[in-house]
Amino acid sequence: MNPKQLIFHDDARDKIRRGVDTLAQAVKVTLGPRGRTVILERDFGSPQIVNSGVLVAKSIELEDRFENMGAQLLREVAARTSEMAGDGTTTATVLAHSMILEGLRYLAGGMNPMDLKRGIEIAIDAVVAELKQLSRPCASSQEIAHVAAISANNDRSIGDLLASAIDKVGREGAISIEDGSGLVSVLDVVEGLQFDRGFLSPYFINNAERQSAVLEDVAILLCEGRLSSLKDLLPLLEEIVKEGRPLLVIAEEVDNDSLAALVINTIRGTLKTCAVKAPGFGDRRKAMVQDIAVLTGGSVVSDEVGLTLGKVKLSDLGRATRAEITKETTTLIGGAGQPKAIKERIATIRKERELASSDYDRDKLDERAAKLAGGVALIKVGAATETELKERKIRVEDALHATRAAVEEGIVPGGGVALLRARRALLTLTGSTLDETSGIRLVARSLEEPLRCIVSNAGDEPSVILNRVDESPDPAFGYNAATRTYGDLLQMGVIDPAKVTRLALQNAASIASLILGTACLIATAPKPLPEEGAHGPGGETPMF
């Protein structure tokens, strides 16, 4: 076992503070409509220009092991917020940084870290409740466009494009993003659907950047039951390999041996493939698999219709222009099904709806019909260079996540104002001890920081603008850093998804509480460097 280095108490907290501070300073510059970009060195190719807090955070690794612990813990805030909300990573980092610095000052004054933590938890619960009161539903297409534009670094064209996509496929519809071939981003709606099932093994991932499996011109095997053996499928698999097509397997269950065989073929490059579970449960699962069969022009392997695995031919497989599979969803784009058959299937589903006896059944049938009718909105991102394309694609993805969050939990005034207004819930709140009350005050002070950071990045004086905004009784009154004007932020289109704001706050408080309760850091001791000019036996340089 390698020897370890240990540091305690004030020394440990000082190292944590330095690491947290270093990462936060790099991430904070990207916040707001006038936030700066960051250039990241890459091992291969040209440097990457980004305006995304989570990408900046992920790229940072500090030389000092103890300082790096602080940086990595703060990075966890950005990563967790990105995973849960898809946006708000920089806000979460700014909040966590402020809470940690404020908390370390209290600890230096001799306060109890556990009481501080309890105070932070009390404050967060009160602020989250206040945010719910401040939020309102995201009702119009214009508001969706505003949310998307703000998330895309104030790019109105991205906002309009996403609003148009949601108009065409519905708020629950599937939206996919891919590289375009021109200078301008375009929207296209194609036959396809999305369902809530992801890959059965991460070894199927072939797009590391998006953590997804992407299969182009894909053949689709649909099984109503359990896929328990690939022996019967070997002749079919050999034909698929000869054609050079990837294979997507959708089945009720895939046993371990079959899954292992598919994974091994993928790793070896013999057959590009992916396996997912069929959507739904019971009879609804059978119906949804049949929906996919109609959409893709395939047949379902089922004992009921007399089609077994040993009898499956290439012509029985469904087809799609592309399949995108993530940990949670599968999106089929450009299904090869006949338009007439798809329309007939939709008509059948609507007749079933008329006969349905419960609201739940009617809702599920409506959902199935909408997925077949709506298709998939395909946003083809255009740019002049590859570097610009990657940066723009990241912004479109951020904007898509933000719009989903806005539809889910509503919207609040943006620009850091919602957190400032929610701070009013803490004005009269106290804990059972002085240290708990200090934890509440710590959160209250930190809620100012996103607004201060946005204003600072815009080149203005944070304290002056903070006081002006805080004095107004209007909850929507704030400062628009893009135009450098005051007014009703909701009317100006400066809005944030309530879910993103809430998760940023909760994740920041979670990591800050953990760090403030830390009393010891343990890291592997660096290996001593060999003395310069050292030689092996007999004065000769050793051979390796």
From Swiss-Prot:
Membrane-spanning parts: none
Pfam families given in the database record: Cpn60_TCP1 (PF00118)
Cell location: Cytoplasm
Name this polypeptide is given: Chaperonin GroEL 2
Residues holding ATP: 30-33, 87-91, 415, 480-482, 496
Gene Ontology CC terms, in alphabetical order: cytoplasm
High-level lineage: Bacteria, Pseudomonadati, Pseudomonadota, Betaproteobacteria, Burkholderiales
PROSITE patterns given in the database record: CHAPERONINS_CPN60
Catalytic activity, EC: 5.6.1.7
SS bond partners: none
Function recorded in the entry: Together with its co-chaperonin GroES, plays an essential role in assisting protein folding. The GroEL-GroES system forms a nano-cage that allows encapsulation of the non-native substrate proteins and provides a physical environment optimized to promote and accelerate protein folding.
BP terms from Gene Ontology: protein refolding
InterPro entries, alphabetized: Chaperonin_Cpn60_CS, Cpn60/GroEL, Cpn60/GroEL/TCP-1, GroEL-like_apical_dom_sf, GROEL-like_equatorial_sf, TCP-1-like_intermed_sf
Subunit and interaction comment: Forms a cylinder of 14 subunits composed of two heptameric rings stacked back-to-back. Interacts with the co-chaperonin GroES.
Organism in which the protein naturally occurs: Albidiferax ferrireducens (strain ATCC BAA-621 / DSM 15236 / T118) (Rhodoferax ferrireducens)
Catalytic activity: ATP + H2O + a folded polypeptide = ADP + phosphate + an unfolded polypeptide
Gene3D superfamilies cross-referenced by the UniProt entry: GroEL (3.50.7.10), GroEL-like equatorial domain (1.10.560.10), TCP-1-like chaperonin intermediate domain (3.30.260.10)
Keyword field: ATP-binding, Chaperone, Cytoplasm, Isomerase, Nucleotide-binding
First-listed, main subcellular location of the protein, grouped into a coarse class: cytoplasm
A molecular function GO annotation: isomerase activity
Family recorded in the similarity comment: Belongs to the chaperonin (HSP60) family.
Superkingdom of this protein's organism: Bacteria
